[in-house]
């Protein structure tokens, strides 16, 4: 292994004797933590140089400094520009003409970028000969000429064009002819593409493994071409309303390699077509039938031959007891079932299903409002290896049932109990699930600090906690979580009225915290947010809406320390022009919601918007639209910023119990 020379000028720095290969291995371990990599590069000149050589992936916020950045990182292979709202042709020309980048670039992400044209895409496709992965999703202005430009990338293997609504069969035909090596093509919501374009892709791109044509106006005509793809593994037909039973029957004549099939929201498919799936796809592992036909005994009988099926999604379907029982008697390899918002799920059918599928790892019962403790008893007795259980708004499940979850499902990593009757005793048992990483307890009005203290004492791996509108939680409970869960990344304490700055000061010890939602906490002030800003340097999302005591003094430390902040909601706070303008120094800031700020003036808002150069999305009160100069708005929109104007009337916040009663009434009406 090559070693660096040690010069007298370096005073025999021991780090210089370490080979590049060993240092590269160290950097590989640091890669998930960008701040650690940055700290590493600042240790010494040698490490700075090595980090530059090691980096393969770059995700800049702006394109202005790309020329100098490219000279520092000569070995880049993946460039993610999704955070750059404005990527003009001049930027793409710089990339494609770079002597170091053009031969090494293999992947570029333009999925949230705008302002490039066919000229820039053509330059990229022609000069970056090793380009294999391009994402231009959301390029709603791109037309066939842009697709034709991309078609010049002869080695392209993955192309994502979701929501490119102006592209037609002509553009996709160019892609099909030019990019013969494609293995993945995403055309979801490309409304101008029909049977002709999809058929051409299927005929010309024989190596396709993944094809997503969801919500395209295609019919059965293109199915015969699709079924002839010899290596197709993942086919997404969500929302293709013109594909019916005949089209599904045609699919069974080929696609022997198919592993994933999504026919959710395909309204023209009836129970008659489902047996085609069972007889044609022996290797199928993932099937999505959500928002489609009723799950009856006859339908499930058609799936009996899917012996390798592992994931089945039936979200939003009407299910019957006989259908659930039939599902229990087939598909023995199932490890994941989703019944979210399925009408008709009862104890009898669900209990039989889970008893027969004890190997389940993921179960989604969101809004299955008819199940009781009977179902929970069967789930916890049979599916002891569950890693994820979602049961939001299962309102007939009594508090005693949650004891069973904690007592029997020790391997849980994700648990969603939003809007349930769980109490402190239930949380005490849930704390036995020591591997839990995601815990959602929103609108759980029976829990208090006592239950949370059990979670804090026993669940050190917790990274996400949702306590939205759980009114019994106070500073003591949050402090317990902060002490016991040092790796916490996300917490939601919105509308927990008794939360004060003490909670935020405690949470400031969680150095990995990146998302804090404390809207509607009237006792929280700028002191607490200042503590968060000073310690939680990875903070990216902050919601302090309706925190009336939050003023400009909180914005100063945020501007100074929270340089990774990307999204902030300041609505209904006491922040003024001064505080808003101070946020201009946060170069990462992209999304801002500022409704009903009494101290905000039109001139102050204009200055702040102009100074915050990275903004891509701003929500504003409609009244400001006529106050801001039109040339200013045009300039900001040209910079890549989108404005969302709201005519929202100030609303008085309801008591948590009144709010839940109102929510239950709405659910009953639905």
Feature roles, as predicted:
Residues 84, 113-114, 139-140, 164-165, ...:
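Conserved "Asn-ladder"/turn position within leucine-rich repeats
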Residues 1-180, 184-189, 194-215, 219-227, ...:
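N-terminal adaptor-interaction module of cullin-RING ubiquitin ligase components
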Residues 589-600, 610-670:
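Leucine-rich repeat domain C-terminal region
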Residues 509, 530, 538-541, 545-612:
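Structured C-terminal portions of repeat-based eukaryotic scaffold domains
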């Amino acid at each position: 292994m090559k070693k660096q020379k040690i010069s007298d000028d370096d005073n025999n720095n021991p780090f210089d004797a370490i080979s590049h290969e060993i240092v590269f291995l160290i950097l590989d371990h640091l890669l998930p933590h960008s701040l650690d990599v940055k700290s590493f590069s600042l240790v010494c000149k040698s490490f700075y140089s090595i980090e530059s050589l090691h980096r393969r992936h770059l995700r800049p916020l702006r394109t202005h400094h790309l020329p100098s950045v490219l000279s520092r990182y000569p070995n880049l292979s993946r460039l993610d520009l999704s955070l750059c709202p404005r990527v003009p042709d001049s930027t793409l020309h710089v990339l494609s003409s770079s002597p170091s980048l053009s031969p090494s670039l293999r992947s570029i992400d333009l999925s949230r970028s705008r302002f490039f044209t066919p000229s820039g895409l053509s330059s990229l496709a022609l000069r970056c000969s090793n380009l294999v992965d391009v994402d231009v999703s959301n390029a709603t202005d791109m037309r066939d000429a842009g697709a034709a430009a991309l078609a010049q990338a002869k080695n392209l293997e993955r192309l994502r064009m979701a929501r490119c609504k102006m592209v037609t069969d002509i553009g996709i035909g160019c892609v099909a002819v030019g990019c013969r090596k494609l293995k993945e093509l995403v055309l979801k919501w490309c409304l101008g593409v029909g049977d002709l374009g999809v058929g051409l892709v299927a005929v010309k791109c024989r190596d396709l493994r993944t094809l997503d044509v969801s919500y395209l106006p295609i019919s059965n005509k293109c199915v015969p071409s699709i079924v002839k793809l010899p290596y197709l593994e993942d086919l997404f037909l969500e929302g293709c309303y013109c594909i019916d039973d005949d089209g599904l029957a045609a699919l069974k004549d080929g696609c022997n390699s198919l592993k994933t099939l999504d026919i959710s929201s395909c309204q023209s498919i009836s129970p008659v077509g489902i047996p085609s799936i069972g007889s044609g796809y022996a290797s199928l592992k993932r099937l999505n039938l959500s928002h489609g036909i009723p799950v009856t005994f006859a339908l499930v009988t058609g799936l009996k031959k899917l012996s390798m099926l592992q994931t089945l999604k039936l979200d939003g379907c009407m299910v019957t007891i006989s259908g659930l029982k039939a599902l229990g008697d087939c598909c023995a390899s199932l490890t994941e079932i989703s019944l979210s918002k399925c009408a008709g799920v009862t104890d009898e059918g669900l209990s039989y299903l889970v008893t027969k599928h004890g190997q389940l790892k993921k179960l989604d019962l969101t809004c299955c409002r008819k199940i009781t403790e009977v179902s929970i008893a069967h789930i916890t007795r049979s599916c002891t290896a569950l890693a994820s259980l979602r049961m939001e708004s299962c309102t007939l499940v009594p508090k005693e049932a949650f004891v069973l979850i904690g007592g029997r499902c020790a391997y849980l990593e994700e648990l969603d109990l939003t809007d349930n009757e769980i109490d402190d005793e239930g949380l005490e048992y849930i704390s036995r699930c020591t591997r839990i990483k995601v815990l959602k307890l929103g609108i759980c009005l029976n829990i208090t600090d006592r239950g949370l203290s059990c979670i804090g004492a026993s669940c050190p791996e917790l990274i996400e906690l949702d306590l939205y509108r759980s009114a019994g939680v106070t500073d003591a409970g949050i402090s317990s979580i902060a002490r016991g869960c040092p790796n916490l990344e996300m917490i939601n304490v919105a509308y927990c009225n008794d939360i004060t700055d003490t909670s935020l000061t405690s949470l400031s010890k969680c150095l990995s915290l990146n998302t804090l939602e404390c809207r509607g906490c009237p006792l929280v002030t700028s002191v607490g947010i200042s503590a968060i800003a000073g310690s939680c340097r990875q903070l990216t999302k902050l919601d302090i809406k309706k925190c009336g005591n939050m003023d400009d003094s909180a914005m100063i430390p945020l501007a100074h320390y929270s340089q990774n902040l990307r999204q902030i909601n300041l609505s209904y706070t006491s922040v003024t022009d001064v505080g808003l303008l101070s946020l201009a120094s946060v170069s990462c800031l992209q999304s801002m919601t500022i409704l009903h700020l009494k101290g905000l003036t039109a001139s102050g808002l204009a200055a702040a918007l102009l100074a915050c150069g990275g903004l891509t999305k701003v929500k504003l009160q409609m009244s400001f639209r006529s106050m801001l100069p039109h040339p200013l708005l045009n300039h900001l929109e040209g910079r890549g910023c989108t404005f969302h104007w709201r005519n929202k009337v100030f609303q008085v916040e309801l008591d948590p119990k009144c709010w839940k009663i109102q929510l239950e009434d709405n659910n009953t009406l639905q």
